Regions:
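Alpha-helical scaffolding segments of alpha/beta enzyme cores, especially the outer helices
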Residues: 21, 25-28, 61-71
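Acidic, His- and aromatic-enriched active-site or binding-groove loops in soluble protein domains
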Residues: 3, 27-36, 101-119
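Catalytic alpha/beta active-site cores
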Residues: 1-48, 260-266
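Conserved phosphate/anionic-ligand binding catalytic regions in large, soluble enzymes, centered on
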Residues: 11, 83-98
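Active-site lining segments that contact anionic ligands and/or coordinate catalytic metals
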Residues: 37-41, 77, 110
Length: 266
């Protein structure tokens, strides 16, 4: 008799930060460990965390979550598979699969991985047989490479700098997407976000609640609205301030090292 798998999903920034304590509560239960046969799948949401905190901050906390969960799983002898809810545009975690898997923490792939492919990219990736074969081979090759040749562990200096950068980036990002800001007035004026909710192309409503504010707008229409005007802003908003901080004399050498030696950052 096959049991229904339990796959926790961590999406927002708070979810990512609390993932370790939540999973520790589960893993500490002996009946739970036996129930899952010491195998756990964990899903990481990319769209919501990026909309919540900005791309840089979300990316670093997604990285940290995996690192922390792997350490925890080692203690309880649990085999972890990460399910990455990413793909499509850069604002939703999309990008070449080789670079994607190289940028994960060491030993987080380990011969297996799950990744979503959003509806809008299915046709372009798998609609033509030779292209589908190429894409699937790319996935296999990327998994093998990330398993046999994992990326290096980040240096303490790198971690310290990226922590500071993510805080600066998040504050800048959240300051911009404040409901009262000129930025949001700009978003409402130049993007077709209201029209998107009337299109029958999604599996869910464009808003979580029937309230006309940015917080209630789902992450996918948020990115999609910007994409319609060819302004891929969710992929970089807030990052400029963080890079300006890291480019100062104090951190410049560390920043150059990160770019050259750390696949997560480059």
């Amino acid at each position: 008799k096959n049991k229904l798998r339990v796959v926790p999903l961590f999406e927002t920034l708070d979810d990512l930060k609390n993932a370790k304590s939540i999973m520790k509560s589960l893993f500490s239960l002996s009946w739970y460990r036996k129930s899952i046969n010491y195998k756990q799948e964990i899903m990481i949401g990319y769209s919501d965390s990026s909309k919540d905190a900005g791309k840089l901050s979300a990316s670093w906390h997604q990285y940290k979550l995996q690192d922390e969960i792997l350490e925890l799983a080692k203690k309880y002898k649990i085999d972890i598979t990460f399910f990455h809810g990413r793909g499509g545009s850069a604002g939703r975690g999309g990008g070449p699969i080789q670079a994607t898997l190289k940028s994960q923490p060491p030993n987080s792939v380990n011969g297996k991985i799950r990744i979503t492919d959003q509806g809008e990219v299915i046709q372009q990736k798998y609609g033509y047989k030779p292209l589908a074969k190429y894409d699937l081979c790319s996935y296999i090759g990327a998994v093998v490479e990330a398993t046999l040749n994992p990326p290096p562990k980040p240096d303490v200096k790198w971690k310290k700098l990226i922590e500071a950068m993510t805080e600066i980036s998040m504050k800048s990002y959240r300051g911009n997407i404040n409901e009262k800001s000129d930025f949001i007035r700009y978003f409402r004026t130049v993007t077709p976000h209201k029209a998107l909710g009337k299109l029958s192309i999604g599996s869910r409503p464009s808003k979580r609640k029937n309230i006309d504010n940015i917080k209630s707008l789902r992450a996918i229409p948020w990115v999609f609205a910007w994409t319609q005007i060819r302004l891929f802003l969710p992929a970089w908003l807030g990052t400029t301030e963080a890079l300006n901080y890291a480019s100062s004399k104090t951190f410049k050498k560390t920043l150059i090292d990160m770019e050259k030696k750390w696949p997560f950052f480059n």
